[in-house]
From Swiss-Prot:
EC number(s) reported in the record: 1.-.-.-
GO molecular function annotations of the record: oxidoreductase activity, acting on CH-OH group of donors
Organism (species): Bacillus subtilis (strain 168)
NCBIfam families: PRK06701.1 (NF005214)
Family matches, as InterPro entries: NAD(P)-bd_dom_sf, Sc_DH/Rdtase_CS, SDR_fam
Gene label: yhxC
Residues that, per the record, bind NADP(+): 45-69
Protein name: Uncharacterized oxidoreductase YhxC
Length: 285
């Protein structure tokens, strides 16, 4: 049948967000062997760093010489596994579990990180949640508030908390999404938060440019992370990513280099921008 979607993954579903990487089939690809020490001696705070894109970024940053603070909700097994990969690179890794939608917790994250490490140089605001609903009428007030707290309020909280520790040359990187540009009829609230993240990135970059702090975003397309089986029905997971020009989902390891570019001195003339890693979809944004 002409309109039948290409199967890209085994059907599967998880009943808890943001999902568990160790339960996924196949496991997401998050590691490559090459390293150049572009982040030697720096420290990065990465929310959602236990799995998915956050794990790939954590491991890549470690390969490049950065100490890593991984902030995650409650996926302890994934977090411990990621910590092992990070520390295998000869750097330090601090795990902090909690809800980034809570401002007090975000303040505590920065407090703990500043006690363990001599500097904080990079903030990766990556944690997110999404809940599929067939229409706006099905989005409860609780879901709406929760999605905004996790996806965008957390970025305000952590940025405010970490800003006194950042110095010239520091970098803030926010995870947006292709949904900020294309929309998604079953992820209305999630897409709205991602649109807010793009504007937050642009506005904050203008606010901090005179301090020498760069602010950018990465807008992934369909990437194989635990959030996918934790969000979508098994039949939808089976064809996940088949609707982009490359006809497959991306792997976290294919997104992580964008974060490294924005965190390193390779991008010293880049701020307020969004990098699109989406399998070929043209968004002109």
């Amino acid at each position: 049948m002409a309109n039948q979607k290409k199967k890209t993954l085994p059907p599967q579903h998880q009943n808890q967000q943001p999902g568990f990487e160790y339960l996924m089939d196949p496991r997401p690809v998050f590691d490559k062997p090459k390293k150049a020490k572009k982040l030697e001696g720096k420290t990065a705070i990465i929310t959602g760093g236990d799995s998915g894109i956050g794990r790939a970024v954590s491991v890549l940053f470690a390969k490049e010489g950065a100490n890593v603070v991984i902030v995650y909700l409650n996926e302890h097994q994934d977090a411990e596994e990621t910590k092992q990969y990070v520390e295998k690179e000869g750097v330090k890794c601090l795990l902090i579990a909690g809800d980034v939608g809570d401002e007090a917790f975000c303040n505590d994250v920065v407090g703990q990180a500043s006690q363990v490490f001599p500097s904080i140089d990079i903030l990766v605001n990556n944690a997110a949640e999404q809940h599929v609903q067939p229409s706006i009428e099905k989005i409860t007030s609780h879901q709406l508030i929760r999605t905004f707290q996790t996806n965008i309020f957390s970025m305000f909280y952590l940025t405010k908390a970490v800003l006194p520790h950042l110095k010239k040359g520091s970098s803030i990187i926010n995870t947006a999404s292709i949904t900020a540009y294309k929309g998604n009829k079953t992820l209305i609230d999630y897409s709205a938060t991602k649109g807010a993240i793009v504007t937050f990135t642009r506005s904050l970059s203008q606010s901090l440019v005179q301090q020498g702090i760069r602010v950018n975003a990465v807008a992934p397309g369909p990437i194989w992370t635990p959030l996918i089986p934790a969000s979508f029905a098994a039949k939808d997971v089976e064809v996940f990513g088949s609707d982009v020009p490359m006809e497959r989902p991306g792997q976290p390891v294919e997104v992580a280099p964008s974060y490294l570019y924005l965190a390193s001195d390779d991008s010293t003339y880049v701020t307020g921008q969004t990098i699109h890693v989406n399998g070929g979809t043209i968004v002109n944004g």
